[in-house]
Structures are given as structure tokens and as C-alpha cells.
Amino acid sequence: MTSLARADDLAAAPLARENCAVSVETKSGVFGFDCAPGETLLYAGLRHGLTLPHECATGTCGTCRARVMTGEVDVAWEEAPGAARFKRDKGDVLLCQTRAVGDCVLRVPAEVAAKPARHQIPAYRTGLMENIRRLTGDVISFEVALSAPMDFDAGQFVVVEAPGLEGARAYSMVNFTRSADRIELVVKRKPSGGFGDWLFGATAEGAKVKVFGPLGRATFHADEHKNLLMIAGGSGIAGMMSILASAAEADHFRTRKGYLFFGVRTLADGFYLQEFAQRVVEAQGNLEVTLALSHEDPAGADHPDHPGVKLASGMVHEVAGRAMAGRYDDLIAYVAGPPPMVDGALRTLITQGGLSPSAIRYDKFG
């Protein structure tokens, strides 16, 4: 997962100089927490253990909608896509883009718990950028050596802030290990993408960054004992790599099936192919991996350099729909990628596959 949040100069905003008391009215009851100066309401609530609704945590999805009932707040990114249809005159805000100026009362139209049932409570850490390497012409992977170990579930993400760069980026972990002292992330370069441009430059190696997480609920748990369907576009493959690593550690594919569909434009745009081929071998026939090419017709049904990786032509959700016909029994589906791709995959999973919402876990990023 990768998504972008923008922020104005914090020094110019009328922020509180000390912790503010925040009260949140939800369908589950009223909860309270303290918010530090300059901290977003979402991050403050999450690090106190509240299961506030969120997806991207960076302003693009609109899931963390809340209404300010009393008190004064500062909105960091007025033009955030996630707030495009909000009733601003009624006090609607994105928790991930809003900071308290003083004590305030919010209303969140969702069920909220005081502590996550399965996931770790997120926290702030610092980290050092290491092992930056190009995977393709426009995709880079990198590691962040963390100031304190992090427990996370496969499929989760963190938000990263870099020195001197406006805003924050959300990235799904590629690796999986408990009490991780480093995390591996991947980013696809985009036009006017400040963080991506910085990574492709010469100054990122060894730089100090700020990390908040883990976040996200599109997670894998081996004890659910389900077949796995994974559909990813571009850098959305990151979380699927973590799921594969966790599944391999649990020997999940000894008794369960896995189907991975990875969408890229052309054969040359594929990455992690050697890792896929190795996972296929380890699964001994219980894992299928297909590289879907949206702008190129493959010369054959299999990758020429990576045995075990199948090739297909078309949009990844369409390729998955054709390949999965009649094979949706007893599975959980994971989807990650740009919103149009995710929406297309969700339609396929619900209308063709007959899956219930509880059997689908997804991340959208812009």
C-alpha cells in the first residue's frame, strides 16, 4: 500500500501548545484520549488503543470521517480527496488530517472498541533508511531500521515522514517477522511524487525518518484456516509478499490453497518474480502465481525466466475473475492497488465469486 498525505507548515497553524482532551462519541459509547500538540486526531486515538475507522490514514479514502461537535480544530489538508463530499459547514473532517487546537468533542458514526481485538496498538518510532535498491525502472525497495522493535500482522502498513519533505506516505510491509527491528517497503515512482523522487535521488540512504504504525486491518491470520486469493496492482504487491511470508512460516499451504494475481503493465515491469517462483516450489502445488500484463500480450503461458510464474493478458481483476471461476470456496480474498483496480476486483469477488464482505479485505491507495 502507498498513499499520500499533505500538510501545511505546522508552525503556521494555530495549534495547541499542550495536550488537548478529546472526547469521541461513537455507536459503542463515549471514549476519551489526549492529543499531543501537532498530532492528528486519528493517530492520537489509535495510539491510545481506540479502533477508530480508517484505511489509508493519509487523506485519500475518506474512511476516518468525523464531525466536530464542540471545540476548535485545524485541518492540515483542506483539499484532501477523502473529504471531497463532506459537509464542511456541519463540521465534518478527516481525523487523519485534523489536529486539535484545544479540548474538543467529536462524533464518529461507527462502532469503536477501546482496544484492538487482534492487532497491535500503533506507536511512533524513528528509523534509518537502508538498503535502497531498484527493482525496475520506476520501483524501489528500501528498509527502515527501527528505533524500537515492531510487532505487526501480515498485510499491515506504516506511515513514513521524511526530513524536509511535505506530507507523509503510507507503505505496506513486504517482510514479516515478529518483533521486527527493521521493515522492508516498496514504492513506485509517480509524477510529482516528492517521496519517490527523494528515494530515486542520492540523499535518502542513511536518512532519519519518522514512522507511525502498524496500521490496517487487511491482515492474514493462519488460524482462520482459509484458502487465500490475493489480487494486487503495482506496489500493492507489498502486503501480499508479507502475507506469503507469514503463510510460509505457518506452513499454511500444506493444507490450504493460494492464488496470487499481480498486475503490471508489461513483462519488464514485473518484480519479486524470483521470490514468487521460490514460494511456488515451497508450496508443492498449492500456490498459483499469475503475472497479469495490462499493456502487452505474453509470448507464452509461463514466464520465460521464472518457472512456476504464469502469464496472462488483461487487467488484473479481469484475469483473476477468469482464472478463479468455480474456485471461490472457503477462501479469504485480499485486494490492494489503485482505487479503480480495487473497485473492479470487489465487483468481481461479490458478483461472480459470491463472497460476503467479511471474506474480503482490501487496501486502496492513490
From Swiss-Prot:
GO terms for molecular function: 2 iron, 2 sulfur cluster binding; metal ion binding; methanesulfonate monooxygenase activity. Pfam families: FAD_binding_6, Fer2, NAD_binding_1. Residues 122-221 form the FAD-binding FR-type domain. SUPFAM superfamilies: 2Fe-2S ferredoxin-like (SSF54292), Ferredoxin reductase-like, C-terminal NADP-linked domain (SSF52343), Riboflavin synthase domain-like (SSF63380). MSAMO is inhibited by metal chelators (such as bathophenanthroline, bathocuprione, neocuprione, alpha-alpha-dipyridil and sodium EDTA) and by sodium azide, sodium arsenate and potassium cyanide. Its cofactor is FAD. Keywords: 2Fe-2S, Cytoplasm, Iron, Iron-sulfur, Metal-binding, Monooxygenase, NAD, Oxidoreductase. GO terms for cellular component: cytoplasm. PANTHER family: NADH OXIDOREDUCTASE HCR (PTHR47354), PROTEIN RFBI (PTHR47354:SF5). This is Putative methanesulfonate monooxygenase ferredoxin reductase subunit. It comes from Methylosulfonomonas methylovora.
